């Protein structure tokens, strides 16, 4: 929650600061500069992972079902070529199989908090705008299970761990109006390795290799 407050405060300060200096006549905003908001949704394909800890070191392949990705971002267009934003959202999938373990309704969720920079290249005399970008920050990773066991020890419930996260992305945006566009984009997202502490003892750790995901998202973007 504190990351969301920090993101909102930072973007609000950025927008208010720009408005004040413009009103005072000290700074002229270039064409196409201003705030923007976007959100997107689509399928997410998790690379096969590794199960690394279950009360001690283990090594098993993790097979994921196709997951879901959603993101929302608020930011600032410096001009028609460069923009920066703060993004959060959701990237999660159900665990299909971990050899040697029973997994009942087990899922891995990632809630990212990222700072992105986007470079756009409008194609002259068209409404098409290709773009590429990258982002860094953290992700709150949640492991949620109804029953995960090795035949001896069982863990249930949800635990979370905050780890480093980053992404790269690219896509093609179509300008519908001066303030509204749609786009189709690809995103590669990766995190550090999360570890979750469960009963029966405070040090019973459940660990995974960090997520490596490929998402295809359809998005709406509003420029103000």
Where are the regions that the model predicts?
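Predominantly the C-terminal beta-signal and adjacent terminal strand-loop region
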Residues: 93, 168, 173, 177-224
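Outer-membrane beta-barrel translocator domains and adjoining extracellular loop/strand segments
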Residues: 49-56, 96-102, 142-153, 195-202
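Cleavable N-terminal export/targeting peptides
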Residues: 1-31
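Gram-negative (and chloroplast) outer-membrane scaffold detector with strong preference
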Residues: 24-28, 43-45, 73-150, 210-224
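Short coil turns and loop connectors of transmembrane beta-barrels in diderm outer membranes
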Residues: 31-33, 80, 123-127, 176-178, ...
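Membrane-embedded beta-strand positions in outer-membrane beta-barrel channels/transporters
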Residues: 36-38, 71, 114-116, 167-169, ...
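Surface-exposed strand-loop-strand hairpins of Gram-negative outer-membrane beta-barrel proteins
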Residues: 43-70, 158-161
């Amino acid at each position: 929650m504190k990351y969301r407050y920090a993101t909102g405060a930072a973007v609000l300060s950025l927008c208010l600061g720009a408005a004040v200096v413009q009103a005072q006549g000290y700074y002229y905003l270039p064409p196409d500069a201003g705030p923007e908001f976007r959100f997107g949704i689509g399928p997410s394909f998790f690379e096969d992972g590794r199960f690394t800890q279950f009360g001690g070191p283990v090594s098993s392949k993790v097979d994921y079902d196709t997951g879901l990705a959603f993101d929302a971002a608020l930011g600032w267009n410096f001009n028609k070529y460069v923009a920066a934003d703060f993004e959060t959202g959701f990237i999660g999938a159900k665990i299909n199989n971990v050899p040697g373990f029973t997994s009942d309704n087990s899922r891995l969720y990632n809630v990212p908090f990222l700072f992105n920079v986007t470079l756009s290249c409008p194609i002259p005399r068209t409404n098409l705008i290709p773009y590429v970008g990258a982002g860094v920050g953290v992700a709150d990773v949640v492991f949620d299970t109804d029953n995960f066991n090795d035949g001896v020890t069982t863990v249930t419930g949800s635990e979370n761990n905050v780890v480093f996260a980053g992404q790269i992305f690219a896509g093609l945006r179509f300008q519908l109006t001066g303030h509204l566009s749609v786009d189709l984009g690809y995103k590669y997202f990766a995190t550090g390795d999360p570890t979750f502490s469960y009963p029966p003892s405070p040090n019973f750790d459940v660990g995974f290799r960090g997520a490596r995901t490929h998402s295809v998202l359809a998005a709406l973007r509003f420029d103000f």
